Protein backbone atom coordinates (compact mmCIF):
# COMPACT_ATOMS: atom_id res chain seq x y z
CA UNK A 1 0.00 0.00 0.00
CA UNK A 2 1.34 3.42 -1.00
CA UNK A 3 0.05 5.17 2.11
CA UNK A 4 1.31 8.63 1.23
CA UNK A 5 -0.31 8.70 -2.22
CA UNK A 6 -3.56 7.29 -0.83
CA UNK A 7 -3.48 9.88 1.95
CA UNK A 8 -3.21 12.68 -0.63
CA UNK A 9 -6.07 11.22 -2.69
CA UNK A 10 -8.37 11.07 0.32
CA UNK A 11 -7.36 14.59 1.44
CA UNK A 12 -8.28 15.86 -2.04
CA UNK A 13 -11.66 14.13 -1.69
CA UNK A 14 -12.73 15.16 1.82
CA UNK A 15 -10.12 17.44 3.42
CA UNK A 16 -7.26 16.60 5.78
CA UNK A 17 -9.37 16.97 8.92
CA UNK A 18 -11.23 13.78 7.89
CA UNK A 19 -8.18 11.65 6.94
CA UNK A 20 -5.79 10.04 9.43
CA UNK A 21 -2.50 8.17 8.88
CA UNK A 22 -1.42 5.41 11.31
CA UNK A 23 -4.52 6.09 13.39
CA UNK A 24 -4.75 4.22 16.75
CA UNK A 25 -7.95 2.19 16.62
CA UNK A 26 -8.30 2.36 20.40
CA UNK A 27 -9.55 5.92 19.75
CA UNK A 28 -12.39 4.55 17.62
CA UNK A 29 -13.70 1.55 19.59
CA UNK A 30 -15.77 1.41 22.77
CA UNK A 31 -13.32 -1.22 24.10
CA UNK A 32 -10.53 1.44 23.92
CA UNK A 33 -8.32 -1.29 22.43
CA UNK A 34 -6.56 -1.70 19.08
CA UNK A 35 -3.36 -1.02 17.18
CA UNK A 36 -3.03 1.50 14.32
CA UNK A 37 -4.94 1.48 11.05
CA UNK A 38 -2.77 2.33 8.05
CA UNK A 39 -5.33 4.95 7.08
CA UNK A 40 -8.70 5.98 8.52
CA UNK A 41 -11.16 8.21 6.67
CA UNK A 42 -14.46 9.75 7.81
CA UNK A 43 -16.67 10.55 4.80
CA UNK A 44 -19.52 13.06 5.12
CA UNK A 45 -21.71 12.23 2.11
CA UNK A 46 -22.93 9.26 0.09
CA UNK A 47 -20.68 10.37 -2.76
CA UNK A 48 -17.61 10.51 -0.48
CA UNK A 49 -18.41 7.00 0.75
CA UNK A 50 -18.79 5.75 -2.82
CA UNK A 51 -15.57 7.44 -3.96
CA UNK A 52 -13.67 6.16 -0.90
CA UNK A 53 -14.51 2.60 -1.92
CA UNK A 54 -13.61 3.41 -5.53
CA UNK A 55 -10.17 4.76 -4.52
CA UNK A 56 -9.48 1.56 -2.59
CA UNK A 57 -10.60 -0.68 -5.45
CA UNK A 58 -8.59 1.20 -8.07
CA UNK A 59 -5.42 0.96 -5.98
CA UNK A 60 -6.21 -2.67 -4.99
CA UNK A 61 -6.13 -1.60 -1.33
CA UNK A 62 -8.20 -3.59 1.18
CA UNK A 63 -10.79 -1.56 3.07
CA UNK A 64 -12.96 -2.07 6.15
CA UNK A 65 -16.20 -0.22 6.90
CA UNK A 66 -17.12 0.55 10.52
CA UNK A 67 -19.60 2.62 12.51
CA UNK A 68 -18.63 3.90 15.95
CA UNK A 69 -16.79 0.71 16.93
CA UNK A 70 -19.13 -0.41 19.71
CA UNK A 71 -19.11 -4.06 18.63
CA UNK A 72 -15.48 -4.25 17.52
CA UNK A 73 -12.27 -5.72 18.90
CA UNK A 74 -9.22 -4.62 16.90
CA UNK A 75 -6.11 -6.76 17.35
CA UNK A 76 -2.96 -5.23 18.82
CA UNK A 77 -1.04 -5.04 15.52
CA UNK A 78 -3.80 -2.91 14.05
CA UNK A 79 -5.29 -2.97 10.55
CA UNK A 80 -3.43 -3.15 7.24
CA UNK A 81 -6.13 -1.43 5.26
CA UNK A 82 -8.12 1.75 4.81
CA UNK A 83 -10.77 2.03 7.52
CA UNK A 84 -13.88 3.86 6.29
CA UNK A 85 -15.65 5.16 9.40
CA UNK A 86 -19.30 6.06 8.85
CA UNK A 87 -20.27 7.85 12.04
CA UNK A 88 -20.87 11.38 13.33
CA UNK A 89 -20.02 13.00 9.97
CA UNK A 90 -22.95 11.21 8.32
CA UNK A 91 -25.99 11.65 10.53
CA UNK A 92 -28.85 13.57 8.89
CA UNK A 93 -32.47 12.79 9.89
CA UNK A 94 -35.73 13.62 8.05
CA UNK A 95 -39.28 13.11 9.29
CA UNK A 96 -42.08 12.39 6.79
CA UNK A 97 -45.26 11.62 8.71
CA UNK A 98 -44.71 8.34 10.56
CA UNK A 99 -41.60 7.59 8.52
CA UNK A 100 -38.10 8.58 9.60
CA UNK A 101 -35.32 8.66 6.98
CA UNK A 102 -31.87 8.51 8.55
CA UNK A 103 -28.26 8.43 7.42
CA UNK A 104 -26.50 5.46 8.94
CA UNK A 105 -23.79 7.25 10.92
CA UNK A 106 -26.17 8.58 13.58
CA UNK A 107 -26.02 7.02 17.04
CA UNK A 108 -29.06 4.97 18.04
CA UNK A 109 -29.45 6.87 21.32
CA UNK A 110 -29.35 10.25 19.54
CA UNK A 111 -31.92 9.08 17.00
CA UNK A 112 -34.14 7.55 19.67
CA UNK A 113 -34.32 10.87 21.52
CA UNK A 114 -35.14 12.77 18.30
CA UNK A 115 -37.88 10.25 17.49
CA UNK A 116 -39.31 10.57 21.01
CA UNK A 117 -39.46 14.37 20.65
CA UNK A 118 -41.39 13.86 17.40
CA UNK A 119 -43.93 11.80 19.40
CA UNK A 120 -43.34 8.61 17.42
CA UNK A 121 -43.21 5.26 19.20
CA UNK A 122 -41.65 1.88 18.44
CA UNK A 123 -37.96 2.80 18.62
CA UNK A 124 -37.63 3.03 22.40
CA UNK A 125 -35.73 -0.29 22.63
CA UNK A 126 -32.79 1.21 20.72
CA UNK A 127 -32.12 4.09 23.10
CA UNK A 128 -29.34 2.45 25.09
CA UNK A 129 -27.78 0.29 22.36
CA UNK A 130 -24.30 1.83 21.96
CA UNK A 131 -23.98 1.85 18.18
CA UNK A 132 -24.90 3.56 14.94
CA UNK A 133 -27.95 2.92 12.78
CA UNK A 134 -25.64 1.40 10.16
CA UNK A 135 -24.23 -1.13 12.59
CA UNK A 136 -27.71 -1.83 13.94
CA UNK A 137 -29.27 -2.58 10.55
CA UNK A 138 -26.26 -4.65 9.47
CA UNK A 139 -26.54 -6.99 12.46
CA UNK A 140 -30.27 -6.52 13.23
CA UNK A 141 -29.48 -5.15 16.67
CA UNK A 142 -32.08 -5.48 19.38
CA UNK A 143 -32.75 -5.35 23.10
CA UNK A 144 -35.58 -5.71 25.61
CA UNK A 145 -38.04 -7.30 23.19
CA UNK A 146 -37.43 -5.02 20.21
CA UNK A 147 -35.14 -5.31 17.19
CA UNK A 148 -34.45 -3.41 14.00
CA UNK A 149 -36.57 -5.67 11.81
CA UNK A 150 -39.65 -4.54 13.79
CA UNK A 151 -39.27 -0.93 12.62
CA UNK A 152 -37.33 -0.94 9.33
CA UNK A 153 -39.21 -0.34 6.07
CA UNK A 154 -36.24 -0.25 3.68
CA UNK A 155 -32.53 0.53 3.40
CA UNK A 156 -30.35 2.09 0.70
CA UNK A 157 -27.02 0.26 0.34
CA UNK A 158 -23.88 0.52 -1.76
CA UNK A 159 -23.21 -2.76 -3.54
CA UNK A 160 -19.94 -4.16 -4.90
CA UNK A 161 -20.57 -2.66 -8.35
CA UNK A 162 -20.65 0.83 -6.85
CA UNK A 163 -24.44 1.04 -7.33
CA UNK A 164 -26.84 2.42 -4.74
CA UNK A 165 -29.79 0.05 -4.44
CA UNK A 166 -32.94 0.07 -2.31
CA UNK A 167 -33.64 -3.08 -0.30
CA UNK A 168 -37.09 -3.75 1.15
CA UNK A 169 -37.57 -5.26 4.61
CA UNK A 170 -37.99 -8.70 3.00
CA UNK A 171 -34.86 -8.28 0.86
CA UNK A 172 -32.82 -7.26 3.92
CA UNK A 173 -33.33 -10.77 5.37
CA UNK A 174 -33.00 -9.51 8.94
CA UNK A 175 -32.53 -12.36 11.41
CA UNK A 176 -30.90 -12.85 14.81
CA UNK A 177 -27.78 -10.64 14.61
CA UNK A 178 -27.48 -10.93 10.85
CA UNK A 179 -28.75 -9.51 7.53
CA UNK A 180 -28.14 -9.66 3.79
CA UNK A 181 -26.01 -6.50 4.27
CA UNK A 182 -23.63 -8.43 6.51
CA UNK A 183 -23.66 -11.56 4.36
CA UNK A 184 -23.00 -9.73 1.07
CA UNK A 185 -20.66 -7.08 2.48
CA UNK A 186 -22.85 -4.18 1.36
CA UNK A 187 -22.54 -0.72 2.93
CA UNK A 188 -25.70 0.63 4.58
CA UNK A 189 -26.28 4.30 3.66
CA UNK A 190 -29.83 5.32 4.55
CA UNK A 191 -32.59 3.60 6.51
CA UNK A 192 -36.34 4.27 6.43
CA UNK A 193 -38.11 3.50 9.71
CA UNK A 194 -41.89 3.04 9.93
CA UNK A 195 -43.21 4.04 13.37
CA UNK A 196 -46.52 4.90 15.07
CA UNK A 197 -47.85 8.07 16.62
CA UNK A 198 -47.57 8.15 20.39
CA UNK A 199 -47.61 10.42 23.42
CA UNK A 200 -44.29 11.96 24.42
CA UNK A 201 -44.71 11.29 28.16
CA UNK A 202 -45.41 7.57 27.57
CA UNK A 203 -42.51 7.19 25.12
CA UNK A 204 -40.15 9.02 27.50
CA UNK A 205 -41.29 6.83 30.39
CA UNK A 206 -40.44 3.63 28.48
CA UNK A 207 -37.01 5.02 27.52
CA UNK A 208 -36.30 6.06 31.11
CA UNK A 209 -37.31 2.62 32.44
CA UNK A 210 -35.02 0.88 29.95
CA UNK A 211 -32.19 3.27 30.84
CA UNK A 212 -32.50 2.33 34.52
CA UNK A 213 -32.46 -1.38 33.62
CA UNK A 214 -29.36 -0.95 31.47
CA UNK A 215 -27.37 1.16 33.91
CA UNK A 216 -28.08 -1.15 36.85
CA UNK A 217 -27.44 -4.42 34.98
CA UNK A 218 -24.74 -3.56 32.44
CA UNK A 219 -21.20 -2.17 32.97
CA UNK A 220 -21.74 0.86 30.75
CA UNK A 221 -19.32 2.94 32.87
CA UNK A 222 -16.36 0.82 31.68
CA UNK A 223 -14.83 0.31 28.21
CA UNK A 224 -16.52 -2.73 26.65
CA UNK A 225 -18.19 -3.92 23.46
CA UNK A 226 -21.60 -4.95 24.76
CA UNK A 227 -22.57 -8.61 24.81
CA UNK A 228 -19.49 -10.60 23.81
CA UNK A 229 -21.37 -13.76 22.81
CA UNK A 230 -24.52 -14.49 20.84
CA UNK A 231 -27.30 -16.11 22.80
CA UNK A 232 -27.01 -19.91 22.46
CA UNK A 233 -30.37 -21.57 21.69
CA UNK A 234 -32.17 -22.35 24.93
CA UNK A 235 -29.63 -20.58 27.16
CA UNK A 236 -28.35 -17.18 28.24
CA UNK A 237 -24.60 -16.73 27.74
CA UNK A 238 -24.21 -14.60 30.87
CA UNK A 239 -25.88 -17.23 33.06
CA UNK A 240 -23.68 -20.03 31.68
CA UNK A 241 -20.55 -17.94 32.29
CA UNK A 242 -21.68 -17.04 35.81
CA UNK A 243 -22.43 -20.72 36.57
CA UNK A 244 -18.81 -21.50 35.64
CA UNK A 245 -17.80 -19.13 38.48
CA UNK A 246 -16.15 -16.77 36.00
CA UNK A 247 -17.78 -13.51 37.14
CA UNK A 248 -14.88 -11.15 37.91
CA UNK A 249 -12.30 -13.52 36.34
CA UNK A 250 -9.37 -11.60 34.82
CA UNK A 251 -6.66 -12.13 32.24
CA UNK A 252 -4.30 -9.16 32.05
CA UNK A 253 -6.38 -5.99 31.92
CA UNK A 254 -9.53 -7.76 30.69
CA UNK A 255 -12.21 -8.94 33.12
CA UNK A 256 -15.54 -10.75 33.02
CA UNK A 257 -17.82 -7.98 34.30
CA UNK A 258 -18.86 -8.25 37.93
CA UNK A 259 -22.17 -6.64 36.96
CA UNK A 260 -23.08 -8.85 33.97
CA UNK A 261 -21.13 -11.99 33.06
CA UNK A 262 -22.01 -11.65 29.38
CA UNK A 263 -19.75 -8.59 29.16
CA UNK A 264 -15.96 -8.35 29.12
CA UNK A 265 -14.61 -5.01 30.37
CA UNK A 266 -11.29 -3.26 29.91
CA UNK A 267 -10.33 -2.45 33.51
CA UNK A 268 -6.59 -1.82 33.19
CA UNK A 269 -5.30 -0.91 29.72
CA UNK A 270 -6.18 -4.36 28.35
CA UNK A 271 -4.67 -5.58 25.11
CA UNK A 272 -6.68 -7.33 22.41
CA UNK A 273 -4.67 -10.46 23.29
CA UNK A 274 -5.96 -10.23 26.88
CA UNK A 275 -9.56 -10.13 25.63
CA UNK A 276 -9.06 -12.93 23.09
CA UNK A 277 -7.42 -15.15 25.71
CA UNK A 278 -10.30 -14.44 28.09
CA UNK A 279 -12.86 -15.26 25.38
CA UNK A 280 -11.09 -18.56 24.64
CA UNK A 281 -10.98 -19.43 28.36
CA UNK A 282 -14.71 -18.70 28.78
CA UNK A 283 -15.60 -20.78 25.71
CA UNK A 284 -13.52 -23.70 26.98
CA UNK A 285 -15.03 -23.62 30.47
CA UNK A 286 -18.63 -23.38 29.22
CA UNK A 287 -18.08 -26.16 26.68
CA UNK A 288 -16.55 -28.47 29.30
CA UNK A 289 -19.22 -27.82 31.94
CA UNK A 290 -22.39 -27.55 29.84
CA UNK A 291 -21.40 -28.87 26.38
CA UNK A 292 -22.62 -25.56 24.90
CA UNK A 293 -20.62 -23.66 22.29
CA UNK A 294 -20.45 -19.88 22.67
CA UNK A 295 -20.03 -17.88 19.47
CA UNK A 296 -18.77 -14.31 19.31
CA UNK A 297 -21.18 -11.45 18.83
CA UNK A 298 -18.26 -9.01 19.06
CA UNK A 299 -16.44 -8.71 15.74
CA UNK A 300 -12.69 -9.39 15.84
CA UNK A 301 -10.59 -7.70 13.13
CA UNK A 302 -7.00 -6.74 12.40
CA UNK A 303 -3.61 -8.27 11.71
CA UNK A 304 -2.97 -11.57 13.50
From Swiss-Prot:
Catalytic activity: UDP-N-acetyl-alpha-D-muramate + NADP(+) = UDP-N-acetyl-3-O-(1-carboxyvinyl)-alpha-D-glucosamine + NADPH + H(+)
One Pfam family named in its UniProt record: FAD_binding_4
Record PANTHER family: UDP-N-ACETYLENOLPYRUVOYLGLUCOSAMINE REDUCTASE (PTHR21071:SF4)
Cofactor requirement: FAD
Associated pathway: Cell wall biogenesis; peptidoglycan biosynthesis
A GO cellular component annotation in the UniProt record: cytosol
Role description: Cell wall formation.
Protein name (record): UDP-N-acetylenolpyruvoylglucosamine reductase
Source organism (scientific name): Alkaliphilus metalliredigens (strain QYMF)
One Gene Ontology biological process: cell division
Enzyme Commission number(s) from the entry: 1.3.1.98
Catalytic machinery residues: 177, 227, 297
Ranges for domain FAD-binding PCMH-type: 33-198
Similarity section: Belongs to the MurB family.
GO molecular function: FAD binding; UDP-N-acetylmuramate dehydrogenase activity
Places the protein is found: Cytoplasm
Assigned keywords, A-Z: Cell cycle, Cell division, Cell shape, Cell wall biogenesis/degradation, Cytoplasm, FAD, Flavoprotein, NADP, Oxidoreductase, Peptidoglycan synthesis
Keyword Lyase belongs to the record: no
